[in-house]
Amino acid sequence: MSSYQKELEKYRDIDEDEILRTLSPEELEQLDCELQEMDPENMLLPAGLRQRDQTKKSPTGPLDREALLQYLEQQALEVKERDDLVPFTGEKKGKPYIQPKREIPAEEQITLEPELEEALAHATDAEMCDIAAILDMYTLMSNKQYYDALCSGEICNTEGISSVVQPDKYKPVPDEPPNPTNIEEILKRVRSNDKELEEVNLNNIQDIPIPMLSELCEAMKANTYVRSFSLVATRSGDPIANAVADMLRENRSLQSLNIESNFISSTGLMAVLKAVRENATLTELRVDNQRQWPGDAVEMEMATVLEQCPSIVRFGYHFTQQGPRARAAQAMTRNNELRRQQKKR
C-alpha cells in the first residue's frame, strides 16, 4: 500500500454529519460558497445567480432614480468644457483630388454587305436570338436559350432574347409494375426440377413468408437446372441467409446469386461467405446494400473468399476499407484472366 493510500485510510471512518453539526453559521456559509464554485454546472447559470453577494452592508437610504438622473444631468451641465490644446484655424492643406477624364474610344463603323444589312434590318426577335447564339454572344441570353439555339436546326426561341425562360416539360415516367412471379408455382417447379426453369426472380416482393422462402431454398438443394437465383429487396434476414448458405453447400448448378438490399447482418453474410467456399459452380455473387454495415471482419472475409474461389468472376459489394478493396480487385482480375484462358483452350 502506497503512502497516499495510507493517508486516505485516516479519513475513511470520519463522520461527516458530526463535523457539520460542530460548524458555526459563518463556517457553513463559507463552505456553501466553496461548494458552489466547485459545482461543474455552476458555469451554466446566469451571472446574476452565479455570483455570490459582495457585501452585507445595509443601504444608507432609499434609492430615488429620478433624483439621481437629475443630479447627473445637472453635474454634466455645470462642468466647464476644456479648451483644445491646438485650436482649429480652418486652414486647408493639400490639393483636392480631381478624377481625370477618360477618353471614350470612338466606335468603329463596320460596314456589311447590302444583303446582310437588309437581312438584319428585317430580322425578327426570334431570328436575332438564334444569330446571337451562333456568334457566341451568350451574355445576351440565358443558358437554355443559348443551347436550344445551337442544338436545334430550327428557330426554337420564338419569343426573342428578352423572353421569360420556361422550364422543360418532361414526360411522366410511370412506376415499374410489381413483380408478377407466382411464388407457389415457382416453388412447385423448383421441387419438380423443371427443365425450362433456369431463373428464379423474386425481386421486390416484400410479403413473402419466411417459411416459404426457407422451403424454396430447401428445394433448390436438389435442383439441377436453375442458373440464377435473385432475392433483391425481399426483406430477407439472417434466417434466409442461413437457408441460402445451406443451399449453396449442396447445390451444384447455380451460377448467379443476388441477395442485395435486404436486412442481412454480418452473421448472415459470414455464413453465406463460408458456404461459397464449398461451391465450385457459382460465378456471380451480389450482397451489397444491406440495412447495416457488415464490418471490417466481413470485408476481410469477402476478400479471402474471392482469393480462394477462382470460379467467381463477378462480385457486387462496395468496400469501405482500402485493404479489402485492393485484395478483392486483384482477385477478380486474376479470376477473370483464368476464365479467359480456359475459354481459349
Swiss-Prot record:
Signal sequence range: none
Subcellular locations according to the entry: Cytoplasm, Cytoskeleton
GO molecular function: actin binding; tropomyosin binding
Expression by tissue: Highly expressed in skeletal muscle.
Pfam family, one: Tropomodulin
Key word ATP-binding present: no
Keywords annotated in UniProt: Actin-binding, Cytoplasm, Cytoskeleton
PANTHER family: TROPOMODULIN, TROPOMODULIN-4
Protein name: Tropomodulin-4
Gene designation per UniProt: TMOD4
